[in-house]
């Protein structure tokens, strides 16, 4: 039986960041996109992306969005830690009510990748089954679907208001 609103099965979304960014997030009262951080003159912020990724985001306009993921593990975190961009990773748990905000988009993979599909959240074809149900992870097809779903992004324009972040918002 199909859900009338498939997005209602999403319990939380996540945003990973360095623990050193938490104070700035608290002080600003919101989780801001990199474009908004630049506009506000915030320079002391550790991004997860490398310079190539930040440039690609700016060129494609993806820097205007806060990037969220579906699970509290993301393939990019390992590389960001290895390269020293993130020292102590914290996953911020985000209330899925953020999906109802105007302008929220869905990316069927890493959003700044050439040719990746980005659409309005209401038109998203999210593989919720592989994200939230028990499956046979030893099946190569299921494993490939899971790895692909881990890279998908929810894109929130400009900022995620603090009311969508858990009261004790660091997770992990």
Predicted regions, residues:
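Active-site-proximal loop/hinge segments that shape catalytic or ion-binding/gating pockets
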Residues: 1-172
């Amino acid at each position: 039986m199909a859900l009338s609103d498939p997005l209602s099965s999403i319990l939380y979304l996540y945003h990973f960041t360095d623990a050193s960014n938490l104070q700035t997030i608290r002080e600003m009262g919101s989780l801001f996109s990199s474009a908004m951080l630049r506009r506000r003159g915030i320079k002391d912020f550790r991004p997860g992306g490398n310079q190539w990724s930040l440039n690609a985001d700016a060129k494609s306009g993806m820097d205007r969005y806060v990037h969220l993921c579906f699970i509290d593990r993301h393939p990019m975190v390992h590389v960001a830690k290895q390269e020293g961009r993130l020292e102590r990773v914290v996953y911020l748990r985000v209330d899925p009510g953020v999906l109802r905000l105007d302008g929220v988009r869905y990316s069927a993979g890493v959003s700044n990748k050439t040719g990746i599909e980005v659409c309005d959240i209401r038109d998203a074809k999210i593989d919720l089954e592989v994200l939230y149900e028990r499956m046979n992870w030893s099946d190569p097809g299921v494993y490939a679907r899971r790895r692909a779903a881990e890279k998908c992004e929810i894109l929130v324009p400009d900022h995620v208001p603090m009311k969508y972040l858990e009261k004790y918002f660091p997770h992990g």
